[in-house]
Structures are given as C-alpha cells and as structure tokens.
Amino acid sequence: ISYIYTSPSSYLHPIRWETTIAESGHGVALYDVLTGKQWNDKDKTMFKNPYSQFVKLETDFTKTWTRDAVSKLVGHINAGIIYSYGNSDWLPNSEMFYVGGANSLRAFPVRGVGPGRFPGYGDKAISYLMQNGDIKFVCNLEYRCQLFGSLHGAFFFDAGNVWNFDEDYDDADARKVFADSKFSFSRFFNDLALNTGVGLRYDLDFLILRLDWGIGLHMPFDTGKAGYFNNN
C-alpha cells in the first residue's frame, strides 16, 4: 500500500510526501492457522521452505523553499521501521534498512554506518552484510544555487543512522559485537552520523546529473579521536 502527495506545481514552497506499508507472510500464516497449525508456531514452511512474516513502514518527506529564480533550500526526511513476528525471528537481509551512499549520508559508503554504535568488522565483506537495521532515520538539508546556465552548485548537510529493536542475540560474541545497536531515545542525537559537503548539479530537464563531495563530521562509535567531531 502506498500513499503519495505532491503539491500543485503553482506552489512556491512545494512538498512531496510518500508513505509505503508492506507485509509478508500474513496470508500464508492465516492459511496455516485454518489448517490446524498455531499462529505462534515457528519454522512453518511453504513448499518445504520457511517463510518470513513482517510488517514494514517507510515514509519520505521533501519540502522545497524557493528563495528566488536561481536558488532554493531543500529539506528531506526519510524514516522507516520493520518488525518481524509469527514465523520469523529474523528479517530477510534484503528488506532491512541501511544508510550511506549518494541518497542518504553522502560522505559515507553504502552500508558504512550502523546499526547504532556498531563500528563495523575488519572484514568489509562481512561488515557490509551486517550494517543494516530494523529502524532508519535520515535527514538532509541542501542549498542549491545557479552558477551559470544549467549548472548549479549545492551545499549539503546529512544526518542519520539505522538501529535494531533489541540486542537479544543467542550468541555471546554477537551480543558483544552489537552492543549499543539498539534504538534508544536517550542516545538518539549522539547516534546520528553527520556529514557535510558541496556538489554540482547539471540540469538536462529530463535528468539531473549530480557530483557530490562530502566529509564526515561525527561518527556514532569510538574512533579514537576525542570530542563530538570525531571523524578521522
């Protein structure tokens, strides 16, 4: 299920809001119940393969403040939550949230931050698979101005992270590694990775070409550098 609202094109300060709700496994689980199985039974299968049950909610909000004909300020918030239940203790990796890259935290690589204060593994291939979470929050603020013709400059600021619902791992080593990966309101602002940067935009009318350069300001885990601005 998806809901999209876009302001009329005549608005000086337009907004765009998109919210999506998705679920998996509910219909199959209901069939299992009707055929005699218990709702909370684990390891139920469909065609001899276990299936996942989860609900996923994601929302994306963008507002543009038009200053004049050649400059604007754009604010963007992207947040999501996914919850497993019933047949599932774990979520499919492909459905979990991650941050980093050109569309979220532009100074960090894809899956380069989180969950929470998790610093990542030395083995980047393993770390790539583990740096995702059940909860996501990303916000961006970008000022754009025309340089000449179709070429525009941009100055941006990004903040965000992903978190887990809990740290209830059966394996003791996993509990140690993912300590502080759980979402906490009291740590929320300190858990946000921050970056800033500059970029270029070339408007082809049907497509905008982007080039960004970002630098990290704050990492949510211990980097060995003192102070809030601890990126090294």
PLM-predicted stretches and their roles:
Residues I1-C145, F155-A159, W163-F185:
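C-terminal outer-membrane beta-barrel translocator/porin domains of Gram-negative envelope proteins
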Residues Y143, A154-F156, G199-R201, I208, ...:
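Residue-level detection of beta-strand scaffold positions
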Residues L147-G149, N195-T196:
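Short hydrophobic "helix-edge" motifs at membrane interfaces and signal-peptide entry regions
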Residues D158-G160, F165, G197, R201, ...:
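Flexible, small/polar- and glycine-enriched "cap/hinge" segments at structural transition points
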Residues A174-L204, F229-N231:
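Strand-loop-strand
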Residues D205-N232:
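Predominantly the C-terminal beta-signal and adjacent terminal strand-loop region
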